[in-house]
Amino acid sequence: LVAANDLQGDDCFVLIRKVLVPIFLLSSAILGFPAVTEAQENPYFVAYDHYLEEPGNLEVEYLSTFGTERGGNDFHSYWTEFEYGATAWWTTEFYLDGQTTFSDSTVLTGIRWENRFRPLRREHFINPILYVEYEHKNAADKILKEVEGHDVEADFLTPNAVARREMSNEVELKLILSGVHKGWNFTENTLAAKNLANSPWEFGYALAASRPLALEASAKQCSFCRQNFIAGLEMYGGLGDRHRFGFGDTSHYLAPVLGWNLPSGWMLRVSPGFGLNDNSHRFLLRWGLSREITGFGPMVSRLFRGRP
């Protein structure tokens, strides 16, 4: 992992040619595939519901977070997700993370491999999902995909040149409990994370609810119909660690969320978030763009077998 500000001359061109350009071309090619899907996605950025990716489908997503930093420099973090429906009960996902701290530098911060499993085949009033994630990242990570333990705003004051040298390997577990009632989705996520070095288990939570602006679909296909928009709210924060469990020295956020599902298969989402105590960033602005590709797995399989 390298910091862009540390690169000079030919090294910068090597990075662009060998790393950034291939990632951009791969994402552009995938996003250019036709998508034929009417699935509605919830607009959450932190919380998860009980829906998995359809088997054989691939979703490509770009997400960003702008955050304010008291006593330091504001930042813009970003990550790309590749989510694949392996089976009807298993969805797997790969992340590539980075961030830019203003008046500091740009850093690639790590990779993540996420897996979600659905133990119950049929829909229930409450649907459990088991979540397992492996993270290889450095201390400059600022994507705030979750808040755990005693994570606070002051942790982000360390300069990138120092923070990126501190590497960690973590395992993250979640129990997701989600259901739908009268068009509303309600979900609760309980988090436990462990740095594989000699560190205690850390805990966190996320709560969310959302609903389409209209439950009945329009008779004609349209982009601005009310049923294409989903609005909601999510709240998330840390719960301390094994030695000091609870709300002491933790940060918490409340964020309205809005998603726009387009008939073409694209989804746009946005969420302004607000810190609820002095340990939290005062303001977070998140936005994202995603595209689902139906039948990606079978299509790739046919390509390798030489069939049309």
Give the positions of each predicted feature:
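Bacterial N-terminal signal peptides
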Residues: P22-G32
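Extreme N-terminal basic, low-complexity initiation segments
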Residues: V2-Q8
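Low-complexity, intrinsically disordered short segments enriched for Gly/Pro and polybasic residues
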Residues: L1, S28, N42-P43
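Transmembrane beta-barrel domains of Gram-negative outer membranes and organellar outer membranes
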Residues: A39-P308
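Sec/Tat signal peptide C-region and signal peptidase I cleavage site
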Residues: F33-A39
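Bacterial N-terminal signal peptides that target proteins for export
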Residues: Q8-F24
